[in-house]
């Protein structure tokens, strides 16, 4: 058990689906965090109404409303679940007040963070970017391969239910691909990365599916790669219980005589690793098919919990 004084107060900026799901996770599961404020701009939003019913302090006046709340001085960590454009302004205001920011938008002001890969390197960063839903699902796999064999090229395809993609996701499609591609390289360890997102209109909606392709050396050890991948899947599932391999890891060897076509004008020999994932949401607030949103809120919560725990330990 943890005493109340061991917990750090958090604010959630953005009272939409992601912000509301994150609030419920903090209230249900957090050991080192407590809700300090839910911040929105729509007084009629379900997220603000739900927060009030749960006894959480609220404001419908955005970042300006947050800094004038009586308990703002107690806020140590803020989650931004708005948009990349809005985050730049929010980050500047919160930085002035010494509040650590966990950014769930593609703004990428701070370092990219995937909890199982590089969180401990950034515990003291003032602003941490959680990449994207596709990044949180696939970068651990790229890293799992790259830690045992060099990854020359990695490509990920994130397929999400169209119904789970709100206006923020749709408005940030370009940022999604750019941010995820960059993080595949800088966090995942691939020499080159590419990201594709697919909005699946199927009804009933399908769960999030992710495909990861990695090209490594032709002589790479398949047993070592598969063992590393399975260990990584278990690590991610420790904070995203619905994260799992959909089928066995697949390997295809391409020789100089029969190279793999990466692009129209590029062919390479090597070992192609194909990993197929499924992410089922916890259905705390969002439907279970919205694993793309659940993995973001779960990763953000895991990051904040570790940051808060490190402060308590200090």
Swiss-Prot record:
* Source superkingdom: Bacteria
SUPFAM superfamilies associated with the record: Glyceraldehyde-3-phosphate dehydrogenase-like, C-terminal domain, NAD(P)-binding Rossmann-fold domains
Locate the residues binding NAD(+). Answer: 15-18, 164-172, 292
Catalytic residues of the enzyme? 133
Matches recorded under SMART domains: Semialdhyde_dh (SM00859)
Q: What class of enzyme is it?
A: oxidoreductase
Q: Which GO terms describe its biological process?
A: catabolic process
Q: Which Gene3D superfamilies match?
A: Dihydrodipicolinate Reductase, domain 2, NAD(P)-binding Rossmann-like Domain
Keyword NAD listed? yes
Give the UniProt keywords, A-Z.
Aromatic hydrocarbons catabolism, NAD, Oxidoreductase
**Catalyzed reaction equations:** acetaldehyde + NAD(+) + CoA = acetyl-CoA + NADH + H(+)
Q: What is its EC number?
A: 1.2.1.10
Q: Which GO molecular function annotations are given, in alphabetical order?
A: acetaldehyde dehydrogenase (acetylating) activity; NAD binding
Concerning its family, UniProt says: Belongs to the acetaldehyde dehydrogenase family.
Question: This chain belongs to which protein, by name?
Answer: Acetaldehyde dehydrogenase
Q: Which organism is it from?
A: Paraburkholderia phytofirmans (strain DSM 17436 / LMG 22146 / PsJN)
